[in-house]
C-alpha cells in the first residue's frame, strides 16, 4: 500500500488572509476599543499587545476557528482578546470596582456574536495562545479567567430561567396591569409581564447580594421558589391562575389555612428550613434596595392573603401595586447595573427574554443538546433522560369531574431538586462519625486506625469544602455577608460528604468481612490512597447533587492529591455499595468514568504511567521523554497547611512517610499483611481481570475476584491473585480492557451514523486493539476519539471506500461526547529525528496528526488488515508469525467485537407484526417533553420517587389485563417484516457477515459538513 493510499485526500482548504491584512485587523480592533467600547488607555494597550503577540497564531489557524468567513473568524479572535484582557488585567491590578466596566455581553453585542458560539470557540484560543497568556499574565491566568465557571453559570441560568417561566405561567395569567403599555401582545412568544420581570430581577438581586458570585443550582432554585412565594403573596389575586384552596396545588394545610411555604416545598422538592431562610434574605433585600416597609402578614387584611396561614410571613403594602411596580423595576435595574459594572460579569437579565439573540441557539456541551435544552451540559458528555427520583406524577385539576393525572415536567432543575431530596432525607439524618460497627472494623486492624481515618476525612473534606468564601463579593450595610453564607453552605456540604463516606465505607467493610469470615481488614483500611478516592467520590456526589459551579470535576482530584486513574478504580465499587444512590448520580459517576478513560487517565501526571512503566518496560523511554509520570501524592500535612486547615493537634498518619519514600503510586500496608492481601468483593464483575478471561467470567459470575487492595498496592508488588503478574500488570490489563470496551461502544455508534458494514466495524475495532497493544504511545496525552477517528479513515482507505475525513468528522459532531477540540487540537511531541524538521511540543489538527504521526506508526498494522494482508497471512508459515509487527508477548489477545447491548429491533412474536427496540440516542430529545413522554414506558425507570420500577411494570400489566375492550383496531402493517429484516444483522446473531466483495461495493452515504 502506497503512502498516497492512506494520506488525506480531502484536506479542508485553509482560510488565509492577504499578508498585509494583519495591519488592517489591528486597525479594526483599535477602532472597536476606542469608539465602541471606550476602553481606557491601559486596557486598550494590553489588548493590542495580546493581539500582536497572538496574530501569527490566528493567521496560521484560520481554518480551525469558527466555520465561516475570515471576517467572522476575526471577530472571534477579537472577542477572545478583549475578554481575556478585561478579565485578567482586573485580576492583576485588583480593580474590581472600576467605572465603565466592560462585560462579556457588551463585547459580544459590539462584535455581533452570541454566547454559545463564543464558548464553543474560546477553548481553541486558550489552547493555542496559552503560552502567550502565561507570559503576559502569569501561570494562573486560566484559573483567574474562570471560563468553566462562567460557562456553567450560563447553562444554569438558562435552565433556571425556563424553570421560573414554567412555574410563573402555571401560577399566574400572562397579562398584567401594565400589559397595555407593551408593544408586544401578552400571548406573544417574546412577551414578559412586568410581574414576571420583577420576579427575575429580585432573584438576580438575591444572587448578587445574598449568594456568592457562582452559586450552585439547588441554592438558586431555592431562591426562585422563595421569589414565587413572594409573588403569590403580592401579585393581585385577579392575575392568579389558581385557587388558593386548590388542595392539589397547595397540599399542606393547617387549621389557619394553607401553609404556603410547606406547599411550595412539597411541590418543588425544596427544604422548608432552607426556603424560609432564603425568603428572609429576599425580604431584607426588598427593605434595603426598594426601601419598602415590612409588616407581619398576620396583621394585614388583604384579598391576596385570604385562606393562607400568615404566621411567620412578611407582607409589603405597596410592593406590586400598579403605581409602584414600574419604579421598583427601575430601582432593581439600576442596582443590577451597578453590580455588573463593578464585576465585569454577564448581564443575566438577558435570560428573562427567551428570544434574546445574545443567547444563541447552539450547544455548549457538544453533541445535539441545544442552548434551549441544555439539560446535562455540565454533568456528562453522554445524554440522559430522567432519574429514578424524577418528580412524581402529580394530579392536575379535575376536568369534567374526572381527575386527570398530569406529568410534572422533567427538567434538570427538577431532577436536581429531587436528587437533593435524597441527600436530605437519606444521608443527612446519618451520624457524622463512624458507627459502632465501623469503629469495630477500625479497631480490629493490626492497630486501631480510627484516629487516622477521622483525621484524614477532616483534612481532605476541609480542603474540598473550605469555610472561606467560594465567591469574592462581600456587601455592606444591613445585608448579610456572603462570606458567612458560603461558610455555612460549605460546612453543610462537608458534613453530608462525610456521612456518605462513612456509610459506604461501612457497607464495603461488611461485605468484605462476610467473604473473609473476619473483621481484620488492615490491608484495605490502612491504604491512604484508597480512602482519598472514597472521600473524593463522596464529595463529588455531594457537589454533583447541588450542581455546584465553583467546584466542578476534576477539582476534587486536585484537592485530594489523587489522579483520574486512581479514582477510576473505586467508582463502580462505590456505586455497587450504595443501593439508594439515585440513578442520576449513578449516571454522573458513569460519565466521570467515561471521561477518565477517554482522556484524563492519559494526561501528563497520571498515575497510570507509573503502573504502565512497570507493566510495559519497553515504554519507559517514551514515558520519560514526554515527562508523563505522576508526582508523589502530597501528604495530609501538606494539604492541611496549603488549605489552612487545623488538624486539632492530632499526630500525623504513621504510614505517610513510608508511602512517599518507597511507594509513590500505592498505599502503605501493614508489614504483617505485605504478602497476604485477601480477595475482595469490592470490585465490579470484570474490572479486575485480564481481557482474555472476560468471556469465562461472563459465563461464571461466581468466579473469584482479584483484590481491590492490589489496585492501590505498589506497582512492582506481585499480584496476590497469582498468575505471575505484578499488581501493575493486572491494573493495566484491567484499564486497557475498559478502554477497549469504551472504544467498541463509540465505534459501533459512529458506524451506525456512517452506515458502514459490519466488516468495517470489526476491522476498526481490531485496529484499535492492536494500536493499544503494540502502539500504546499513540494514546499518550491524547483523547481516544482521536485514535478512533484516524482508525476509521485508515480502514476506509485500505478498504477502498469512498469515505472522506469530512464525512467522518461531520458524523462525529453528532456524537453526544463530541468536543471540537478533539479533532482541532491533537498533542504532538516531535522527536529530534522528525523528518519534517519540527521539534518540541505543539497541538495540531487531526489531519496533520494523521499524516505525520498516525500513518507512519500504524501503516504496518493497516497493511495486515487489508485484503492483501489477509491473503498474505493465509500463505505465511507458522515461523513467520513472530515478526516485528506481530502481537508482543504478554499483551492482551485480540478479541472479536464484544456483545454490546443490542440496538436492533427484535420481533416480539411470530404471530404478531410487533417490534420492540432499545431507545436510540436520536429519539431521546423527543422524550424530554412531558406530552411526548407520556406515550412511552421506559423500562427500568420509575414514575415515582423511591418506587421500584417493578411496581410500575405490575401496574402496566394490570391495566393491560383489565379486559377493557379497545374500540379500534391497531394497524400492524405500518412496518413490514421486510423493512425490519434488514436491520436484524449479525448483532442479533441471525445472519452472517456479508462477503468482503459485497461490502466494498456498498455505497457510502455522503453528506456535506456542517458549517
From Swiss-Prot:
State the Gene Ontology BP annotations.
Answer: cell differentiation; negative regulation of G1/S transition of mitotic cell cycle; regulation of transcription by RNA polymerase II
Query: What GO terms are given for molecular function?
Result: RNA polymerase II transcription regulatory region sequence-specific DNA binding
Q: Does the keyword DNA-binding apply?
A: no
Q: Where in the cell is it found?
A: Nucleus
Region Pocket, as annotated, extends over 411-860
Spell out the InterPro entries in the cross-references: Cyclin-like_sf, RB_A, RB_B, RB_C, RB_fam, RB_N
**Organism domain of life:** Eukaryota
Is Transcription a UniProt keyword of this protein?
yes
Region Domain A: start-end pairs = 411-612
Keywords, sorted A to Z: Cell cycle, Nucleus, Repressor, Transcription, Transcription regulation
Ranges of biased composition (kind: Polar residues): 873-889
Query: Where are the residues of the annotated region Domain B?
Result: 730-860
Q: Which GO terms describe its cellular component?
A: chromatin; nucleus; transcription regulator complex
What residue spans carry the region label Disordered? Answer: 1-22, 872-903
Q: Where is this region: Spacer?
A: 613-729
Task: Kindly give the CDD domains that the UniProt entry links to this protein.
Answer: CYCLIN_AtRBR_like
State which residue ranges cross the membrane: none
What the record says about family reads: Belongs to the retinoblastoma protein (RB) family.
Relate the protein's function as given in its record: Regulator of biological processes that recruits a histone deacetylase to control gene transcription. May play a role in the entry into mitosis, negatively regulating the cell proliferation. Formation of stable complexes with geminiviridae replication-associated proteins may create a cellular environment which favors viral DNA replication.
Q: Output this protein's name.
A: Retinoblastoma-related protein
Q: Which gene encodes it?
A: Rb1
